[in-house]
């Protein structure tokens, strides 16, 4: 699952490079909803969320530690391993459902929720282990940035005068 879990790290630079505006006349500019860059971002986000969802359903040890550490550090709760594993089961279903909805429906609000969730889970390293683990959070910022880029690309389509439907 590791290659899929890191799909956004490959998709982010490639998809964003293809999504950026081109100088006039250099290339035919396709609308964002049909661009190759959007598809790369879409597949990268879906792959990452699916892989993380599967790891959560398997009660991956590091994820258990993140839940227990964050609960203790921020709200003073003593979360047991069984409680953390129950939460991971819910989170796993949540992540896989989000990935499926993103691929099947391409709703803008799903990409927005995935962005918030991706940033929150990236920052969970700092919330569980303290500021010294900022580099782990930074390495995972694409988990929220890629869905945010999708949200913004689809939002641009909706706001453009030629657009009549919402992606």
Protein language model features and the residues they cover:
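Extended, low-polarity transmembrane helix blocks
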Residues: 1-61, 81-93, 103-167
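Membrane-interface loops
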Residues: 61-67
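Perimembrane loop-to-helix junctions flanking transmembrane segments
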Residues: 67-79
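Conformational-control "hinges and anchors"
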Residues: 99
